[in-house]
Amino acid sequence: MKTTLLKTLTPELHLVQHNDIPVPSLKTCGWNTKNFPCKGHSLSVGXPQNAKQDVLWLSEVEPFKNGNAIRGGVPICYPWFGGVKQPAHGTARIRLWQLSHYYISVHKVRLEFELFSDLNIIEAKVSMVFTDKCHLTFTHYGEESAQAALHTYFNIGDINQVEVQGLPETCFNSLNQQQENVPSPRHISENVDCIYSAENMQNQILDKSFNRTIALHHHNASQFVLWNPWHKKTSGMSETGYQKMLCLETARIHHLLEFGESLSVEISLKG
């Protein structure tokens, strides 16, 4: 991958080019945050400085090419979810966002990115706040109601040693288009693409291989989406990539976002 330094914004924050994509890169405030591609919008890799492993996952074969959704981090599915229109999961995850504001101190970092229409009208904003936790907030500014999902890819040690806690015992299985009863806590042993009702705004990913728990606190979500492609061939991923990742998405699918409404998730690490 070709990487070029474009601009130094502060001693801690740099704008670099990874192949086709401009990427703000940050290291400070208790978090090592390697990439914020201005496309998607996706925080690619990050972890508290005292963490032994990254919290977020990025595909080792990610090409950082225009027109392709980034396979990893937190791409934004917006203004629609799924394949109801093309491209699947909306246009926001394949468009360039603008870094509009940044604040950096010893104990806190705040970055804001905005998405504009062809007429230079703001459509959406993403803010990322890093303290000892990571707080991601998406705000919808479009005139029409919209769906949205924070498609978070979590880095795990071994998919066979993961337990997802706090999910309901029923879900909509997108693979067979049926409502199903499922166990909770949930273990992953096959291709999973399930939409859950957001009955409990807190989930935990128990990662036994890395001996840690990733805690999620969702705000203003109506659904969660649990996804792992297993052996299914997936663009932007290696054949074994599924073994090291799990997506648990904070979503507004059936209850649409109205102008000015936000959707957010707080991510923290235990262990």
From Swiss-Prot:
Gene3D superfamilies, alphabetized: 2.70.98.10
Catalytic reaction(s) noted: alpha-D-glucose 6-phosphate = beta-D-glucose 6-phosphate
Molecular function terms from GO: carbohydrate binding; glucose-6-phosphate 1-epimerase activity
CDD domains documented for this protein: D-hex-6-P-epi_like (cd09020)
A biological process from GO: carbohydrate metabolic process
EC number, UniProt record: 5.1.3.15
Binding site for substrate: R71, R93, D193
Enzyme kind, highest EC tier: isomerase
Isomerase in keyword set: yes
Keywords annotated in UniProt: Isomerase
Listed PANTHER family: APOSPORY-ASSOCIATED PROTEIN C-RELATED, GLUCOSE-6-PHOSPHATE 1-EPIMERASE
Name listed for the protein in its UniProt record: Putative glucose-6-phosphate 1-epimerase
Lineage: Bacteria, Pseudomonadati, Pseudomonadota, Gammaproteobacteria, Pasteurellales
